Amino acid sequence: APLEYRGPFKSIPTKIPGVHFSEQFKESAKIADKITICRSMSHGEAAHERGTHNMFTGYRPSPALAYPSIGSVVSHDFGSRANLPPYVCIPKVPNEFAGSGYLSSSYGPFGLGGDPAKGDFKVKDLTLPNGITEDRFNKRRSLLNTVDDHFRQMEKSDALSSMDNFYNDAYSLISSKEAREAFDMKKESDKTKERYGKNEAGQRMLLSRRLVESGVRFVSMTY
């Protein structure tokens, strides 16, 4: 394409014959045969908000129906594994269309509440609060179960079921060493972090890889 259309950067060949990337993606070009290039994504919306809805749900916006995000559909259909949330957003839930829509809110995304690109990165509520021992934690959980059993006998609702699932997932995260390690960026060497790039995009992608390898089924990353 002419310079005025393509910009100042040239294209370079990749590992896939006939496929070219921008010269800014030299390392990606070397492994192009190991990634999937999505060419089918398009939409006819003029507004960014409506286009974002399409991206996250696969549907055009409807005034009559709140569609679930693709991550929530995956969460609903496949569930969790390895005590990890099935659907995680890095670093946080990016917009209202990333939610569970008409599905139960228990299939909504798990937001980190922190940025893996920052040195003090910590996932919210993944460890016990200061001053709370494991014994005290277990007693609180037992008391909560007693109260919940009482309410379940009196009333059934999506809100109560979702809270049950929320607490159970939280307990699994806190009590699982493997789950905590999946979010622990300190497990990665400086060399690996350098290869991904010590910036927002690189470190968020690195954490995404860790989570998928550990058992998270769907990761949505924003940078």
List each language-model region with its residue ranges.
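Ligand-binding pockets and gating/stacking loops
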Residues: 1-223
